[in-house]
Amino acid sequence: MRLIDLERLYDYHYWANRRLLEAVSQLTPEQFTQNVAGSYGSIRSTLVHVLSAEWGWLDRCGGPPRGERLKAEDYPTLDSVIETWNRVERDMRAFLTQLTADDLSREIEFSLGSGPTHSIPMSGLLEHAVIHAVHHRGQVSLLMRMLGFAPGNYDLLVFDSQPRETPAARQ
């Protein structure tokens, strides 16, 4: 994947995150932490999982260290999640601007849980982080619908139809 394509993918990713977090802000604190059907139990837990994973992959690729996996109970409010997510977004965008084509092709080793070690080019790992978030945004959207909210549409086609700054204008 070319760096310009990866930057576009992350532009989409953070656009969709902001829209989702705006939708989640409609929830009461109780709804935000309420256990509902889903792989992580609550909207808060799902968001913290995605945030922890993204920061972890950034760390694995050579960005700022995350340390231990983030825990939902350390994020009592949506604002606390947003604060950390804004920091991770800034760090990821800064990291992406420093990458070269050689960096993107560099093999990164990782394991999933206690399983075997795998190796994948950095570009694939960075793509995975976005695809992983898409999956969980869908879960959060479903959970919000179960709670009676309309979370909106986060499709890439919707993003592409929105006017936005060019990469040069952001610098």
Regions found by a protein language model. Name each.
Residues 7-71, 112-171:
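Short, contiguous alpha-helical
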Residues 108-110:
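Short acidic-hydrophobic surface loop/beta-edge motif
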Residues 64-105:
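Helix-adjacent hinge/juxtasegments
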